[in-house]
Every structure is written in C-alpha cells, then in structure tokens.
Swiss-Prot record:
Residues 1-22 are annotated as: Disordered. This is Argininosuccinate lyase. It is found in: Cytoplasm. The lineage of its organism: Bacteria, Pseudomonadati, Pseudomonadota, Alphaproteobacteria, Rhodobacterales. The keyword Amino-acid biosynthesis applies.
Amino acid sequence: MTDTGSSDTNTDTTGTSKANTMWGGRFAAGPDAIMEAINASISFDQRMARQDIEGSRAHAAMLAATGIVESSDVDVIREGLLTVLSEIEGGTFQYSTALEDIHMNVEARLTEIIGTPAGRLHTARSRNDQVATDFKLWVRDQMDAAISGIEALQRALLGQAEAGADWVMPGFTHLQTAQPVTWGHHMMAYVEMLGRDASRFRDARTRMNESPLGAAALAGTSFPIDRDMTAEALGFDRPSANSLDAVADRDFALEFLSAASICAMHLSRFAEELVIWSSAQFRFVALSDRFSTGSSIMPQKKNPDAAELIRAKIGRIFGANVALMTVMKGLPLTYSKDMQEDKEQTFDAADNLMLALAAMEGMVRDMQANVPSLEAAASSGFSTATDLADWLVRELNMPFREAHHVTGSLVKLAEDKGCDLPDLALSDMHSVHGDITDGVFDVLGVHNSVASRTSYGGTSPVQVREQVARWRDILG
C-alpha cells in the first residue's frame, strides 16, 4: 500500500485544554499534554487513511440502504469522504494529535467540509469495529502484496534454475561438502520454500476475510444494520459471527507476522549463502554493482550489503511477531488500549518484508554464477563418495553398511595420498577391496553423479527442468 502520510508531515502537535469533541461529553477538562502524547496514534495510523475512508463509505451506503440515515445526507457524506481522501493523497491534509487517530481526524475534517451530516456517519458504529475493519483491510492488502513479491522472486529463481540446470556445484551438510548437486536444483529449493510462504499468506487471508464492521463497541447494535452488505462492499466473504471476538481479534495480524517471519527466515538463509558465495574464498557468484557497495578506505572492496541488510532486517520482522503476541497475551475481552500497539510493528514488518523481497529479487536476477568455481568445488571434498558406496551395493551386491565402510577406507586412502577419489589408481582401490573393477570410475565424476539422481525431486538436470516447468505452470 502507498504510504499516505508520515509522522513528520502535516501533523499539528499542539495540545488542547478542551475536552475532545468526539467523546468529551462526560469530561470537564481535556487531557494533559503527556496523556495526549501517549494516547495519540495519528503519527502512524494515518497509513490506514484509505482503508478508513473506504470502510466509512461502505458503512454510510448501508445506513442509507437500511433507512437509518437519509439518503440525501449519505450522498453528501460519501462525496465529502472522497474530498478528504483527495486531500490526504495530495499531501494537503492537516493531521492533529489532539484528535488522536485517523478515524477522528477524518471525521473532524469531514465535519468542516459538509457540516451537520458528518455527525450521522458514526451511527451504529464504534471506533472498536472501525479500527478492526481498517486494520484488517490494510493487512489484507499487505498479504496480497507479499504474495506478489514472493511470486516475482520465484520467477527470478526459475530463470536462474533454468539457466543452470546442468551446472554442478557442491551440496552441503554442516557447511561441509556432501554430494554434488546442480545449481538449478539449489535455486529450486528456494522456489519450493517460497511457495509454502505464499500458501501461508493465502491461507491466512482466507481465514481473516470476515468483516468486523457492525460489531460496534463489543455487543453489536440495536439499529437494523445490514452487515452482509458492508462485508460484500469491502470484499469480505462474510461478517464475523461474534461481536466480542470481532473487536478483540488480532489473529489476522499475528498470522500475517507469523507468515512474514517464516518467509523472512527463508530470505535470510539465502542472503547468508549469497554473502558466503560472493566471498573471495568461495567465488561461487558475482553480485551486480546495483546491489553491492564499496569501502571508503579499501578501493578493492565490493561488499554484498543488500544481502547483509536483508539478513539484518529479518530480525525486525521476528521482533514484530513477538511484540504483538506479547501485547495480546494478557488482554481480557474485548478491546483495550494496549491494542493500539498492534500497528507500528506490523507496519514496520510489512515494509521490511517487501523491501527484502524486492532486494532479493533484484540480486537474483542480476547475479552471475561462476560455473568453473562451482564445478571445481563440487569435484573436491570426496563429494562422490556416496556414489561409490552405491556402486559397491549395485555391482558387488555388497550390504550398504559394508559398502559404507569400504568407501570410508578409500576416502582415507585418498586423503593420505593427497588426492580425490577419481584420482586413485585401480590398484589403490584393490588394496582396500580386490573385487572393485574399473567400472567404478564411471560414477566418480560429478556430472555422472548428478545425472544419476533421477528420483522425483532429485538433482538431475532432467528433474530440475521438470520442476521448473511445473512451477512456471503454477505461477502462470
């Protein structure tokens, strides 16, 4: 969502000694300046201005349709709300901390524009269901944006996977060489992870798509409202079934943050790999100048700052998830002012997730694999030892545990000789097991190794290309 305001733009921070005109009927005096400062949320919840006005226009239309408010008044209200939105999007709207939040700032400005009819807008509505509606709409938009960002990154990874379906690289366990894999297979691992991330956002979106509007403060309303009408107008599947739950619920934000945290964790893992791979010690990839920076003192440096910043920003997303769970864990039903603290961390997490997705997509599209370095690394570290053990099982009918032991002895022999397994002479192998034939050398090359891994989901180029085609079909 486009940010419709910021904490340092068009905000009047002047205090007031008068009671708030929106709720001050039972108060003899206005809040202390410190109370006003701690109570105000307009510095951040102005980001929900579009959703607030969208919800108010839907509510107003329903008030007219049900005969609760005259249609002539509602027409003026709905047009006035568009004027307010135009001012906000044009940057001329003056926010006031004395009015606390986006809801009262919008209503106050609407009153200035159209007069008395504005006072009818809040009929059959509370700020409790209003803010829940606004926040749900905002989070829903962010879920859609996250899915789009994930799919863009997946497409970039598919391009790398397709180009490198045959490129051999080391696969790692414990960051030690394990078995040869293909570059394309490694890229497709992240496509799969991100696919689960997108599905989590979709699942959460489906679950949260119930409208709280009409729950009022907590108990519903005595006015003959049509909650189905407002739910449909706002793109919800249905109205929420329990008014207490509707205003108390922030599960939708928690599910967004949970899905964002898991997605962010995947991005951080890949960022860590890119930092390592782009180092002089690995030289697996070259990151583009567009996503790197230099040093103010060391002229030779090309630093993977985008990857490092992705890795760091992920902590803010994790922190937001924990922060909101901590806010919510001790709250009795229904609404407490604590819940005002649900937004800033969610806004920040959404911003950082979208930034991380975009930066990762750019890095992936631009990065160049160093194919000779990848293959050289894949060919070292006895990476085809498992292929040798499998060959002993197939060709000599050896139990796998015995094959494992024989292979381990051959690895030790090669290590003592300072060579890799393919460099051992057949006579060397006979010193460990006399039945080994020269056919063993067919499986010790890394290209033969990856080509043999044809099981579904395996690393063979054939499997990689099939998985790329499957995902291109999924993404459309």
